[in-house]
């Protein structure tokens, strides 16, 4: 998972292999 701060609501908002954390950011 790329170490880039991205806001998200769903895993699909993130890069592949990243998940949407409860914090509202991809990780």
UniProtKB/Swiss-Prot annotation:
KW Cytoplasm (keyword) present: no
Compartment list: Secreted
CC annotations in GO: extracellular region
GO molecular function per UniProt: serine-type endopeptidase inhibitor activity
InterPro entries named in the record: Prot_inh_squash, Proteinase_amylase_inhib_sf
Keyword Flavoprotein belongs to the record: no
UniProt keyword annotations, A-Z: Disulfide bond, Knottin, Protease inhibitor, Secreted, Serine protease inhibitor
Major place of residence: secreted
Disulphide linkage map: 1-18, 8-20, 14-26
Alphabetical list of Pfam families matching this protein: Squash
Site residues (Reactive bond), renumbered to this chain: 3-4
Record family assignment: Belongs to the protease inhibitor I7 (squash-type serine protease inhibitor) family.
Function summary: Inhibits trypsin.
Domain notes: The presence of a 'disulfide through disulfide knot' structurally defines this protein as a knottin.
Protein name stated in the entry: Trypsin inhibitor 5
Organism of this sequence: Sechium edule
UniProt lineage: Eukaryota, Viridiplantae, Streptophyta, Embryophyta, Tracheophyta
């Amino acid at each position: 998972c790329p170490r880039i701060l991205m806001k998200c609501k769903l895993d699909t908002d993130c890069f592949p292999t990243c998940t949407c954390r409860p914090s509202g950011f991809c990780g």
